[in-house]
Amino acid sequence: MRSFILRARSAPTDSQRLLDEIGGKCHTEILAHCMMNSLFTAQSHREDVVIHLVLESTRDYSRTITVEANEISDVGGFHEAALIALLVKALDASVGMGKEQTRVVQPGLTVRTISFEALLGELAEHHSLYMMDKKGDSIRDIKIGPNPCFILTDHIPMPKKSGNSMKRLGVEKISLGPKMLFASQCVTLIHNEIDHQEAGW
């Protein structure tokens, strides 16, 4: 199972604001782009992939929207608008939820009022954790561990205090090259590299 976490620190948990910020300063379109590149291939979808989108611009609690490739159906298309519509559906379903609650929106689509740190703590129990960092070891020079989970951010960098907690959880820093890339581009390159490793190329 491959997992991805996108920590979207500027992404609003209000569905209308999410829509308003497509192409705006919060760049909420990145959420759809990461979903598209993590879950789908040409004319198909990947198996055994999960993406967690953590939206943190909120008046109450962060929202973690989880999409499971093996379970999701009725997506409505592979385009940005269809994927944004799924996020809107999840956010609308989360209205009124208390802290650390879970709501199944539809098969393969879940929303939780859980923080990035709490989510990471859960995943650390059964996943090999990797954080994208330009100064990390090249992904081509390491052996990817079982059940890898790759941690990405939007245009707002990861805060230093999170770096300390990730270090305690054993998160490894890895690099995809010398250039800073969009999170969605990182997802594609990660998939490609693991595809090569698994195929023995």
UniProtKB/Swiss-Prot annotation:
HAMAP family, per the entry: tRNA_methyltr_TrmY
Keywords: Cytoplasm, Methyltransferase, S-adenosyl-L-methionine, Transferase
Domain of life: Bacteria
Organismal lineage: Bacteria, Pseudomonadati, Pseudomonadota, Gammaproteobacteria, Vibrionales
EC number: 2.1.1.-
Enzyme category, top tier: transferase
This protein's name: Putative pseudouridine methyltransferase
Binding site for S-adenosyl-L-methionine: M132, C186
Database matches in SUPFAM superfamilies: alpha/beta knot (SSF75217)
Species for this entry: Vibrio cholerae serotype O1 (strain ATCC 39315 / El Tor Inaba N16961)
Any GO MF annotation of the entry: tRNA methyltransferase activity
GO terms under biological process: tRNA methylation
UniProt subcellular location: Cytoplasm
Record's GO cellular component terms: cytoplasm
Family from the record: Belongs to the methyltransferase superfamily. TrmY family.
InterPro entries (UniProt xref): Alpha/beta_knot_MTases, TrmY, tRNA_m1G_MTases_N
Cytoplasm listed as a keyword: yes
